[in-house]
Amino acid sequence: MTVVRPTGDDLVAMLAALANPLRLRIVATLAGGPDYVSHLAREIGVSRPLLHMHLQRLEVAGLIVGHLELSDDGKAMKFYNVADFDLHLNATVLAEAAKTLTKSDPEKGSAAKEKP
């Protein structure tokens, strides 16, 4: 089995997406199987617009995948499922990922990537 390690930017996006309790609940719910937006919103107890915002963030981070399916009455329904990922973190993985960061550190400002 080939181990693929995320780049620093991918790792930051994934961890930032999972740092939100609601997004963590969304991933946990979808781990049980694919679900469509309206049902998922009712299941989790949030509005569809709020759910859409969080689903987009998770999709951009590569943690979930969305696809359209037609219902029996011909209505398009957006389903989401968990993407195939297996994330293992330790100091070595973090150090390797940090070497590949392309985005500046917001805490250090735009000068973070500049060399003297």
Model-inferred region functions:
Residues 10-50, 69, 76-81:
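N-terminal helix-turn-helix DNA-binding core of bacterial DNA-binding proteins
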Residues 42, 59-60:
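Alpha-helical residues within the helix-turn-helix
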Residues 33, 57, 85-88:
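Short, charged/polar surface micro-motifs in flexible loops or helix N-caps
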Residues 60-73:
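Beta-hairpin "wing" of winged helix-turn-helix
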Residues 72-116:
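Conserved segment of winged-helix/HTH DNA-binding domains
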Residues 1-7:
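Long, low-complexity, charged/polar intrinsically disordered regions in eukaryotic proteins
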Residues 54:
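Residues within the DNA-recognition helix of helix-turn-helix
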